[in-house]
């Protein structure tokens, strides 16, 4: 895991439901925790593009449902402001299920991946078809 150049807005609080954009069998997941989040007392932890989160699978194959797994946020609907002044936002909030060390469990990612997530997680960048 590397540091990222820009600092996107934290837009996904605990409890947010996201699309799972890989071929592991999960379709929809819910964020239940954010790794390495240092916040304020009584404030919900929130995630942004490139963060590792802990998710539970809400919709998917019977083998995947109800499992608690680590995942990385690859897209968010809230716009990301980059250091060069450009702004990027996506049509949905999406995650990719990964191993605890950050390598993707699936072999394919559907849709684009934010540049911030690809820079931070080389394993995700390897299997991404489109990096924006």
From Swiss-Prot:
| Gene Ontology CC, one term | cytosolic large ribosomal subunit
A Pfam family annotated for this UniProt entry: Ribosomal_L14
The record ties this protein, via SMART domains, to: Ribosomal_L14
Q: Which UniProt keywords apply?
A: Ribonucleoprotein, Ribosomal protein, RNA-binding, rRNA-binding
Domain of life from the UniProt record: Archaea
Q: Which InterPro entries match?
A: Ribosomal_uL14, Ribosomal_uL14_arc, Ribosomal_uL14_CS, Ribosomal_uL14_sf
Q: Does the keyword Transmembrane apply?
A: no
Q: Which GO molecular-function terms appear in the entry?
A: large ribosomal subunit rRNA binding; structural constituent of ribosome
Ribosomal protein as UniProt keyword:
yes
The record's listing under Gene3D superfamilies reads: Ribosomal protein L14 (2.40.150.20)
Identify the SUPFAM superfamilies for this entry. Answer: Ribosomal protein L14
Explain the purpose of this protein. Answer: Binds to 23S rRNA. Forms part of two intersubunit bridges in the 70S ribosome.
Oligomer and partners: Part of the 50S ribosomal subunit. Forms a cluster with proteins L3 and L24e, part of which may contact the 16S rRNA in 2 intersubunit bridges.
HAMAP family per the UniProt record, alphabetical: Ribosomal_uL14 (MF_01367)
The protein's name in its UniProt record: Large ribosomal subunit protein uL14
> What organism is the protein native to?
Methanocaldococcus jannaschii (strain ATCC 43067 / DSM 2661 / JAL-1 / JCM 10045 / NBRC 100440)
What does the organism's lineage look like at the top?
Archaea, Methanobacteriati, Methanobacteriota, Methanomada group, Methanococci
């Amino acid at each position: 895991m590397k540091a990222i150049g820009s600092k996107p807005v934290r837009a996904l609080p605990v409890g947010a439901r996201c699309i799972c954009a890989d071929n592991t069998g999960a379709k929809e997941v819910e964020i239940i925790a954010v790794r390495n989040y240092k916040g304020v007392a009584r404030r919900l932890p929130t995630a942004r593009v490139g963060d590792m989160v802990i998710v539970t699978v809400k919709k998917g194959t019977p083998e995947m449902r109800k499992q608690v797994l680590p995942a990385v946020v690859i897209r968010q609907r809230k716009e990301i402001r980059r250091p060069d002044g450009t702004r990027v936002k996506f049509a949905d909030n999406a995650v990719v299920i990964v191993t605890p060390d950050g390598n993707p469990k699936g072999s394919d990612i559907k849709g684009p991946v934010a540049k911030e997530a690809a820079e931070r997680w080389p394993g995700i960048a390897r299997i991404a078809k489109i990096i924006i």
